[in-house]
């Protein structure tokens, strides 16, 4: 890992794995004009599950460099909190509860960490999921048990209307056990099920157990920083379901698997674009201590779609 040089302009960082491939590097200057902020963005790339000392070095750099104002963290949200949480002067309740952080900022000389994903995943989900969706009798299936899975699962479990079951699968046991304990505290009476599924075919079988009108979410990171899908190409999505690919870039294999079945099985397929926009604007608001109103967000969404050639 190579740390950035000392900032000479107000700087926000993006801590990820392949930050140079993110649309934010192109979009940030346009957003800065809309928001009236004079700042630049730089990426800090770390391997998945990096050395704890590398996480501490990144946090120490931001903490002690005057013009380094903060950062958005992706992929490393749990690991950076576990490795460097003690270096923060303040962690918000979500960061403490979920042992993860997606936002690093400074206020009055204090280094602050926030877990914004429970908010941003909820905003993104509300943008496309019908309000009466859980009246249709479906389940929710979250594939993955990392920070994004924790966030969207906690949001779903915090709503008055809920799925028949919340099902979580993961390829490794440690994080699956951790998310089970966490959700047990958040919603002890909710109907939840947890499955160790190291192979795609095992996730396929879980998928086939879901009733029609379910919500299926890829929260694994596969299809973005790493190619592939948590499902095999033989998977069958339940009819009338909503399929959410958290990623908006990469090979997006999971999303394409759903799109191939969309017409025949009446699927609604979403990528992670709106999640990306909400995720970044929430953290930018924290780093620069500004308010991003719905009107400003709408302007950012419109301009970003134009720049990236996306249909609105």
Task: Kindly label every feature range from the protein language model.
Residues 2-131, 250:
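Phosphate/diphosphate ligand-binding glycine-rich loop within oxidoreductases
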Residues 73, 218-222, 245:
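Redox-cofactor binding/interface segments in oxidoreductases and associated redox assembly factors
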Residues 15-18, 112-118, 132-158, 170-175:
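Glycine-rich adenosine-cofactor-binding loop
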Residues 161-189, 193:
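NAD(P)-binding Rossmann-fold cofactor-contacting core
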Residues 63, 172-175, 200-231:
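Rossmann-like NAD(P)-binding element
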Residues 294-312:
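A short, charged, Gly/Pro-tolerant segment at domain boundaries
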Residues 103-106, 223-299:
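Rossmann-fold NAD(P)-binding glycine/threonine-rich loop
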Residues 4-8, 134-136, 159-161, 209-211, ...:
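Short, conserved loop/helix-junction motifs that constitute active-site signature segments
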């Amino acid at each position: 890992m190579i740390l950035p040089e000392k900032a000479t302009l107000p700087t926000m960082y993006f801590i990820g794995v392949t930050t140079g491939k993110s649309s934010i590097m192109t979009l940030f200057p346009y957003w800065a004009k809309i928001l009236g902020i004079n700042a630049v963005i730089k990426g800090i790339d770390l391997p998945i599950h990096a050395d704890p000392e590398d996480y501490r070095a990144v946090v120490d750099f931001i903490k002690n460099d005057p013009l380094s104002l903060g950062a958005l963290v992706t992929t490393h949200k749990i690991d950076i909190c576990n490795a460097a949480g003690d270096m923060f002067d303040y962690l918000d309740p979500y960061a403490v509860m979920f042992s993860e952080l997606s936002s690093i900022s400074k206020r009055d000389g204090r280094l602050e960490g926030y877990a914004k994903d429970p908010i941003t995943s909820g905003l993104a989900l509300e943008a496309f999921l019908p309000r009466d969706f859980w009246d249709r009798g479906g389940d929710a299936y979250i594939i993955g048990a990392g920070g994004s899975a924790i966030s969207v699962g906690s949001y779903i479990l915090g709503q008055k209307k809920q799925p028949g079951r919340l099902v979580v699968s993961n390829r490794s046991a440690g994080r699956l056990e951790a998310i089970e304990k966490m959700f047990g505290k958040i919603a002890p009476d909710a109907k939840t099920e947890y499955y160790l599924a190291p192979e795609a075919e095992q996730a396929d079988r879980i998928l086939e157990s879901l009733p029609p009108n379910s919500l299926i979410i890829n929260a694994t990171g596969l299809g973005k920083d790493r190619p592939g899908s948590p499902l095999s190409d033989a998977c069958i999505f339940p009819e009338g379901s909503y399929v959410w690919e958290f990623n908006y870039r990469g090979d997006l294999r999971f999303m394409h698997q759903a799109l191939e079945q969309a017409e025949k099985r009446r699927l609604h397929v979403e990528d992670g674009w709106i999640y990306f926009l909400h995720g970044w604007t929430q953290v930018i608001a924290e780093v620069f201590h500004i308010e991003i109103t719905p009107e400003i967000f709408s302007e950012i969404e419109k301009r970003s779609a134009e720049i990236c050639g996306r249909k609105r």
